[in-house]
Design a protein with these regions (language model features):
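C-terminal segment of N-terminal export signals and the immediately downstream linker at the start
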Residues: 1-41
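A sequence-level detector of short, solvent-exposed, charge-rich linear segments
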Residues: 20-24, 47, 107, 137
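Alpha-helix initiation/capping motif
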Residues: 24, 49-50, 71-72
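Short, surface-exposed binding/anchoring microloops in extracellular/periplasmic proteins
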Residues: 37-52
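Rieske [2Fe-2S] iron-sulfur-binding domain
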Residues: 54-147
Length: 147
């Protein structure tokens, strides 16, 4: 009876998919975007340049479709790091980084454009790229899935 019941337990991959994910940021160069997977979903981690940060902070967020200031999308004192879902909020495609008119992401499926803060600026997507829970563990490591 026990072998049958134990087969109902989730496999190691399923269990691991729900656990927090540690990411070492040290090798990520300024201006580089990396993709990781957490809970089976792609996540963008963007090491933003000073130009990208300034552009995101000075944009008129109140006039955007899904208004949100850059300060609500990054951690205080760590504005160079943006961590968002890599899934377009229109129909679920994966946008391409550093493309489009806003130095952010461009979704080739239907033309949605996001800025360097992951906010929707143009196209059919209704919402900003979703934020994911994460916290810093020191200066060069984040833990996705914890706050």
């Amino acid at each position: 009876m026990w072998p049958f019941i134990s087969q109902l337990n989730p496999d190691a991959g399923t269990v691991a998919a729900g656990f927090p994910l540690e990411v070492d940021l040290a090798p990520v160069a300024e201006g580089q975007v990396i993709k990781v997977f957490w809970r089976g979903q792609p996540i963008f981690i963007n090491h933003r340049t000073p130009k990208e940060i300034e552009s995101a902070q000075t944009a008129d967020w109140r006039s955007m479709r899904d208004p949100q200031p850059d300060s609500e999308r990054v951690k205080p004192g760590k504005e160079q790091w943006l961590v968002v879902s890599a899934i377009c909020t229109h129909l679920g495609c994966i946008p391409t980084e550093h493309q489009g008119n806003y130095d952010g992401w461009f979704c080739q499926c239907h033309g949605s454009q996001y800025d360097s803060s992951g906010r929707i600026r143009l196209g059919p997507a209704p919402l900003n790229l979703a934020l994911v829970p994460y916290k810093f563990d020191g200066d060069a490591k984040i833990v996705i899935g914890e706050t």
